[in-house]
Amino acid sequence: MALRAAVFDLDGVLALPSITTSWARAEEKLALPRGFLNEAFKKGGQDGSVARVMTGEITFSQWVPFMEEDCRKCAEDSGIRLPENFSVKHIFDKALSEKKINYPMLQAALTLKKKGFSTCILTNNWLDDSAQRGSRAQLMCELRPHFDFLIESCRVGMAKPDPQIYKLMLDTLKAEPNEVVFLDDVGTHLKPVRDLGMATILVRDTDTALRELEKVTGVQLLQTPALPPTSCDPSALSHGYVLIKPGVRLHFVEMGSGPAVCLCHGFPESWFSWRYQIPALAQAGFRVLAVDMKGYGESSAPPEIEEYSLEVLCKDMVTFLNKLGLSQAVFIGHDWGGVLVWNMALFYPERVRAVASLNTPFMPSNPNVSPMEIIKANPVFDYQLYFQEPGVAEAELEQNLDRTFKNFFRAHDETFLTTNRVRELGGLFVGTPEEPSLSRLVTEEDIQFYVQQFKKSGFRGPLNWYRNMERNWQWGCKGSGRKILIPALMVTAENDLVLHPKMSKHMENWIPHLKRGHIKDCGHWTQIDKPAELNRILIEWLETDARNPLVDSKL
């Protein structure tokens, strides 16, 4: 029978360095004999303190004194003296603080899952009440979404190598033994697995283990292209609603803890456009709030054009922060969301911890030139003139939502659309296929999510963002001459045909602390076109420029 399930140990397999490697480093530093800590650990035995901590009978902090005593006994038996600064707690704290995800092994698990394998983490673990418990919690939060099942010894009251925990694993997977491969870095944990009839791999180093895993599964795992970042399942997220004023609410999804990061999408999109960024930013230690902007999805879509002026939209976002009790947030925007976040930084700098825009440059209002003059002078913006007459573009875009989104969400080398001569042609989709093919950027499920969202909201609200050019210009002129002095990031996309990188050329004149990121071979839909590259740029910038300073209560 073919293998259809893969089970991974945590320590020494999915997370490195292994505890034994950390012990060896501690032994060297403390001038203890090699293997000393492992011998002391074994003294706890399957019937002693180790079994009690691994099965959740006692916590880590309760177990530490037992390990201290076992170390003292081992030292006496070996005729050595423990250093004065010897501390089991410090050794384990250090080991946990150093532990990182073994990404090649994780990618192998993801590849197998994509090929139809069920995946499971089976780990001997303790109830962690130590000073480093946050590190362990973060590690588990990062790994858990990638696996179908997680079995922790301290949660089920049994631990490896007890055969009962492997039988529980088989029941959980609903698999026969000969359908499962199990990877562990401890040989004694594998013997009962083999006795039950499962395939086993003893992990000494990652490359060798992956070669063995390739061989037994028949799936290529080495030298494979990196898988895209994890996407969001809308049904598995926390959804929230903030009442901005009577009749107007903003919907958002939320993930993570830490400094708040508010994600603002563009046209014609949804919070779902950030589906590859939300988990990555949350795992990096941020509280992510991805908003359905006004007019979209489950947020309110009032019909009045003036409801979508930048002045009103920014006031809405300030109310959004107030209602959530947030004094500041990092604002990251794309397309129209980029315009919004630059204006938040310009008019409400005290509420913006840092600001970043994808594709959309900061373009200060010129009191001497109206925006309509600029748009009319640039043929690539003709579509915006087509959007001005209420009801016209709505009729075209709402006629066949499946066609609409398959036309919009395309890579730069797949596009059917032209943004110039739209009025002359009589519409944005004139000359495009009635049944467009699916772009490589999206799945059919992605398209249907947008279809369902716009069945709720329609296109009037989203198009009203374009119908406030004069109001936005007049408001923007009130900030004429101001500079944006807060931490800022501009991410350009090489192949965005409308928001071309050259448009951001002079931004440093207005934003002296501006940092930049540039993504090659990327079109307009940056978040889904190059999600891994974007996530790397955003996380590096957030870590250096956007961590919240300590705030003292004023009460």
From Swiss-Prot:
Region of interest: Phosphatase: 1-224
Subcellular location field: Cytoplasm; Peroxisome
N6-acetyllysine modified-residue sites: K43, K191, K215
Binding site for substrate: Y383
InterPro entries in the cross-refs: AB_hydrolase_1, AB_hydrolase_fold, Epox_hydrolase-like, HAD-like_sf, HAD-SF_hydro_IA, HAD-SF_ppase_IA/epoxid_hydro_N, HAD_sf, PGP-like_dom2
Subunit structure: Homodimer.
NCBIfam families linked to this entry: HAD-1A3-hyp, HAD-SF-IA-v3
Protein name, UniProt field: Bifunctional epoxide hydrolase 2
Gene: EPHX2
